[in-house]
Amino acid sequence: MKKNFPFHMVTNSPWPIILSFSFMNTLISTVIWIYSSISMFMILNFINSILIMMLWFRDIIRESTFQGMHSMFITNFLKFSMILFILSELMFFISFFWTFFHSSISPNIEINMTWPPKNIKFFNPMEIPLLNSFILVSSGFTVTLSHYYLIINNLKLSKSYLLLTILLGIYFTILQTIEYSNSFFCFNDSIYGSIFFMATGFHGLHVLIGSIFLLISLYRMMNIHFSNMHNMNFELAIWYWHFVDVIWLFLYTFIYLLI
């Protein structure tokens, strides 16, 4: 850190370009899985991306916690960057909702101008979707409690509630997997099937990423990397998790409940 120079000059890192290629391979293998039902490459590339992210997080933890590179100035810019990232993710979901409303309010003649399309047996919103809603809302409450207990220096309860939040996120992912496996329609079944699996699947991916984000926070909390004054990583993870919660409420309302 140079004198009178508030920015952290990051050393050369291979992780951004490597992670970019790994994400590209993951997306390509996902398309292959959709068309050929071969999921092995997608799973391997996804695991590879997770491992690269862990290595990148390791470097960031070393720079912030042990080298003291993240000053208040840097911390504020990181928070602003997280806000921009969440807004960019919001644009993705706005595009999905736009497609959904465009197709449902003015159905195409190719689907007999009816919505939902005929022969589409959709899910009962009072079963797994409602349970998932309770799970995510509860997880938002537990992660807020975890942050509160961290602020008042009660690490034991903070870790307990954070672990409960992660378990709720994993439970949500398991239930969504069960829901997909029992679906009576697939991605190729009209515009409704495409929108449904794209929107809910993209949200499910965010839940998985958020769970990993919180798991890293739990690891750091167990290693006493956080204090009641310095817990930016955990705070950003909470922002992301609440964003995922709110998006699910909109998905449940419009795609499940008001269909």
From Swiss-Prot:
Single GO BP term: mitochondrial electron transport, cytochrome c to oxygen
Keywords of this entry: Membrane, Mitochondrion, Mitochondrion inner membrane, Translocase, Transmembrane, Transmembrane helix
Subcellular location: Mitochondrion inner membrane
Top-level taxon of origin: Eukaryota
InterPro entries reported in the protein's UniProt record: Cyt_c/ubiquinol_Oxase_su3 (IPR024791), Cyt_c_oxase_su3_dom (IPR033945), Cyt_c_oxidase-like_su3 (IPR000298), Cyt_c_oxidase_su3-like_sf (IPR035973), Cyt_c_oxidase_su3_a-hlx (IPR013833)
GO MF entries: cytochrome-c oxidase activity
UniProt topology in membrane: Multi-pass membrane protein
Stretches that traverse the bilayer: 15-35, 37-57, 80-100, 132-152, 160-180, 195-215, 238-258
Signal peptide limits: none
EC numbers on record: 7.1.1.9
The protein, known as: Cytochrome c oxidase subunit 3
Designated gene of the protein: COIII
